[in-house]
Structures are given as structure tokens and as C-alpha cells.
């Protein structure tokens, strides 16, 4: 933060609340895949489908997935479109594919007890979750996390010492993800 001029600095001394965006401000801004569950007999094709679609996206989570998967055979995608609320649909090898947050799973996708438990575990851990279904069959669940900046907690403590009463964390991420980062930083 850069403050210029004595009036601005004086006015800033009366600030009692500071709102921070999470991604790239309090976290490093480079999410990484921490967990991957596959529910398919053909993991090679499944990972190629995932990589082929995610390579078309500039979303930070898509970039993390592509990096994690490494080089994969690229399959032609058709009828690709972004889903409002967090996902993408496409047709690959004549099959309908949906990738995104849990909301992209249609009601036709029936989760096994293992899949439901894996999703619940990642949600409870505060991971950002990306799922992929092919023809309404869940095939991939990914847990993705961004690391808190090493000096963020100390900087927040300094703001408190300077008299800032409230430090607020703002994010469009899943509530559990935001809670995990807030706990790590000592925010309430």
C-alpha cells in the first residue's frame, strides 16, 4: 500500500477496518493440486480428457491442474462452453464432459459412498474442489490449495498493533476454504 501526502496519512490513521482479497494478496496466488481421486478403469484417457479441456482455460485452478498433470495427449474438444457458477462443458470423443466445482455435477450423477466421502473430506479440509464427470459418471475429484504468503500473518499482526480493529478476509471461494485461510492467519 502506498500513501502519498500528509492528509492521506493522517486520515489513514483513523482507519479501523481493512478488507483483504484472499487470492494473491494473503495467499501466494499459485494454487496447486494437493489431492487427486480417480474413479475409472481408464485413467490415461480420463487424464487426457481433463488436460485437453483445462488447457483451453486461463482460470488459475485450470492452470494448476494442467501443471499437475504434466504432458498429456491432447484430444480434440467440441461444443466447449463455460458454465455460469464455476465450470466448463465440452464434448470429447463424442462424450459429454463437465468440469468445475461441485455444482457442475448434474442430478443424474450418482455418487458412490467412497466418492461422497472423498468430497466431504476435501471440503472439510478447506480445499478448492474440482470435479470431472463423463456422461454423468464422476471420474475425477481434485483438491486444490493456495499457500498463505509467508509474511502475511506478521503483517496482519502489525496492522492490529497500529490500531486496526477489524481485518476482513473477502473471497469468492467455498466457505470452508476461506475459513481454513482465516484460521491459518489468525483472523476470525
Give the residues covered by each predicted segment.
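Conserved catalytic-site loops of classical short-chain dehydrogenases/reductases
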Residues: 1
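Cytosolic catalytic headpiece
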Residues: 4-188
Amino acid at each position: 500500500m502506498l500513501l502519498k501526502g500528509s492528509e492521506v496519512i493522517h486520515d489513514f490513521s483513523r482507519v479501523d477496518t481493512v478488507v483483504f482479497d484472499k487470492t494473491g494478496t494473503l495467499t501466494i496466488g499459485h494454487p496447486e493440486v494437493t489431492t487427486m481421486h480417480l474413479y475409472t478403469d481408464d485413467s490415461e484417457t480420463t487424464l487426457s480428457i481433463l488436460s485437453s479441456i483445462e488447457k483451453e482455460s486461463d482460470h488459475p485452478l485450470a492452470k494448476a491442474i494442467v501443471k499437475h498433470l504434466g504432458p498429456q495427449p491432447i484430444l480434440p474438444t467440441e461444443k466447449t462452453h463455460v458454465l455460469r457458477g464455476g465450470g466448463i462443458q465440452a464434448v470429447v470423443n463424442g462424450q459429454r464432459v463437465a468440469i468445475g466445482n461441485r455444482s457442475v455435477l448434474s442430478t443424474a450423477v450418482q455418487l458412490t459412498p467412497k466418492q461422497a466421502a472423498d468430497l466431504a473430506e476435501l471440503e472439510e479440509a478447506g480445499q478448492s474442489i474440482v470435479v470431472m464427470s463423463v456422461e454423468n459418471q464422476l471420474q475425477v475429484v481434485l483438491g486444490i490449495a493456495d499457500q498463505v504468503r509467508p509474511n502475511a500473518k506478521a503483517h496482519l499482526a502489525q496492522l492490529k498493533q497500529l490500531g486496526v480493529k477489524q481485518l476482513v478476509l473477502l473471497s469468492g471461494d467455498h466457505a470452508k476454504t476461506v475459513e481454513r485461510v482465516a484460521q491459518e492467519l489468525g483472523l476470525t
